[in-house]
A protein has these predicted regions:
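Helical "substrate-binding/catalytic lid" subdomain
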Residues: 57-148
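Generic hydrophobic, helix-prone segments enriched in Leu/Val/Ile
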Residues: 23, 62, 102, 152, ...
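Short polybasic/polar patches that bind polyanions
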Residues: 45, 85, 164
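C-terminal active-site/capping subdomain that shapes the small-molecule cofactor and substrate pocket
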Residues: 116-188
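Short, well-structured alpha-helical segments
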Residues: 41, 95-99, 153, 177
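Rossmann-fold dinucleotide-binding core
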Residues: 1-63
Length: 188
């Protein structure tokens, strides 16, 4: 059983209830013999969770997707905090403010219907097609920490792809593509 849930170090938990809480409603990939899978499915049902089938050959990709969604989110907060602190926020202000921003962004995405495009949960310069603001952000990040500028560029390029079927229009998308193409990549 592999849950799509962030589980803290069990040594830090105060009770069994706290240990189970993140598992309630989670999606679980199950593997093993048919009997083991049936038992796992019963446990998942008791937790109000959902069972998904993941082929053995696809398991590394499944785990990578989980790492992108959870662990890389921590890395993203780390680099965002560093930029906010460099901009003048205290570490506590950066953590509280950016943590709140991330939570409200996740909440907005989770409120979307399952079949809705993720772009409907997007806010900010890319969603508006504001290439000039994206360019200013990239320039500031490049002065602060070039690897963070590259990270922002690569993630923004994914956001532009999300916006391709939106009402932005070809001129705004082309302007965003042009700005993002100007960020130096390793080896260039």
């Amino acid at each position: 059983m592999h849950p799509l849930a962030a589980l803290p170090d069990p040594l830090d938990l105060d009770s069994a209830a706290a240990a189970v809480r993140p598992l309630r409603g989670a999606t679980f990939a199950v593997a093993g013999t048919p009997a083991a899978q049936a038992t796992a499915a019963e446990l998942v049902a008791l937790l109000g969770g959902h069972v998904v089938a993941v082929a053995d050959g696809a398991r590394p990709l499944y785990h990578a997707a989980a790492a992108l969604a959870a662990n890389d989110l921590v890395a993203l907060l780390q680099v965002a905090e560093q930029a906010a602190i460099a901009a003048g926020l205290t570490p506590a202000q950066a953590r509280a403010g950016l943590g709140h921003l991330m939570q409200t962004a996740l909440d907005a995405i989770r409120r979307l219907p399952d079949d809705a495009p993720l772009r409907l949960g997007l806010t900010g310069a890319v969603a508006r097609g504001d290439a000039a603001t994206v360019a200013r952000h990239l320039q500031a990040l490049n002065q602060h920490h070039p690897p963070t500028a590259l990270l922002h560029c690569l993630l923004s390029a994914e956001l532009v792809e999300l916006m391709r079927d939106s009402a932005l229009g070809p001129a705004a998308l082309a302007a965003l593509d042009t700005v993002l193409a100007q960020v130096p990549r390793p080896g260039e």
